[in-house]
Regions:
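RNA substrate-binding interface of SAM-dependent RNA methyltransferases
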Residues: 25, 29-36, 43, 47, ...
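N-terminal positively charged helical leader segments and presequences
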Residues: 1-107, 111, 115
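Structured adenosyl-cofactor binding patch, chiefly the S-adenosyl-L-methionine
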Residues: 28, 144-145, 150, 166-172, ...
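A short acidic, often aromatic-flanked loop/helix-cap motif at beta-alpha or helix-coil junctions
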Residues: 72-77, 94-96, 184-188, 206-207, ...
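Surface-exposed amphipathic alpha-helices with a cationic face
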Residues: 60, 188-192, 266
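Short beta->alpha connector loops at strand-helix junctions that form conserved
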Residues: 70, 91, 128, 154-155, ...
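Short basic, glycine-rich beta-strand/loop surfaces that mediate nucleic-acid
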Residues: 77-92, 169-173, 177, 181, ...
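Active-site/ligand-binding-proximal alpha/beta "capping" segment
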Residues: 199-249, 253-255
């Protein structure tokens, strides 16, 4: 049994089922995909630019309750000054509750549950020790874009889903299943029992991401920038690959590295 859960961390006390989203992209995606889950949208009346007018017009056309506010109150609501003048109070969406359930659905249907129809086999992104919410948000965004089925991280020493993560993810935090597991190495072992090939990234690996077959069921495992994967995580992987670096810098940010790996997998799968 693979243990998994989606954890939300809110910056403002609310009911157990509600949370705050902020930023044009995150709120806009929620209004577009699940308007009935949006209780109300607070917006900065001091913003009178074209983008704000277009946003409030779309929200109003969708039947969303609009509440006039100001920048300071919005910052207090979401815990960030990067709200762009928009904060929404929303209901938590129904999520796949466990990684087991997700994988069983994939196995039963044999069809892609992600956004890209060319992805037939499970494509998972595993993050080991990624604690920065901006990095997590960017990883969720690229995982959603590449058609990955889920992102997995350990419960300890990892960022949870917060308003900042949702804002950076630009709506992907609402659509991409994010599972936080008790024991990452054990979870990788259980994925391997399901014939999912676990491929870790390492600067000293002989083969590059472009040298391996990514068309089968795979989990791409990446560590935090600088520290990399923990030793046990590294040992549990079936194979290690590197991302070739041809310039002065030695490594990529974890979200950029995730994008390189996921889109190489997508490229290979589209060619099959």
């Amino acid at each position: 049994m693979i243990e998994g859960s989606v954890r939300y961390i809110d910056n403002e006390p609310m009911s157990s089922s509600s949370k705050n989203l902020f930023g044009f992209h995150a709120v806009g995606v929620r209004i577009k995909t699940a308007p009935k889950s949006v209780f109300e949208v607070f917006y900065d009346v001091q913003r009178r630019d074209a983008r704000m007018r277009a946003f409030t017009d779309r929200a109003r056309d969708s039947g969303i309750k609009l509440v006039e506010s100001d920048g300071l109150r919005l910052a207090k609501m979401c815990g960030s000054h990067g709200h762009q003048g928009v904060v929404a109070r929303v209901d938590a969406l129904a999520q796949v509750t466990s990684l087991d359930e997700l994988l069983e659905n994939l196995e039963a249907s044999g069809e892609n549950l992600g956004v890209n129809a060319s992805v037939k086999n499970p494509l998972l992104l595993v993050l080991d020790g990624v604690t920065d919410p901006h990095n997590l948000g960017a990883c969720l965004r690229v995982a959603d874009g590449a058609g990955a089925h889920a992102v997995i991280a350990p419960k300890d020493h990892a960022a949870g889903i917060s308003a900042i993560v949702s804002k950076v993810a630009s709506g992907a935090a609402e659509t991409m299943p994010y599972f936080m597991v008790t024991n990452l190495a054990r979870t990788l072992g259980e994925l391997k029992e399901r014939n999912i090939w676990c491929i870790g990234t390492s600067d000293d690996a002989e083969k590059t991401i472009y040298d391996v077959d990514l068309t089968g069921p795979i989990a791409l495992v990446l560590g935090a920038e600088g520290e990399g994967m923990r030793q046990l995580t590294r040992k549990t992987c079936d194979q290690l690959v590197s991302i070739p670096m041809h310039g002065a810098v030695e490594s990529l940010n974890v979200s950029v590295a995730s994008g390189v790996c996921l889109y190489e997998a997508l490229r290979q799968r589209r060619a099959v």
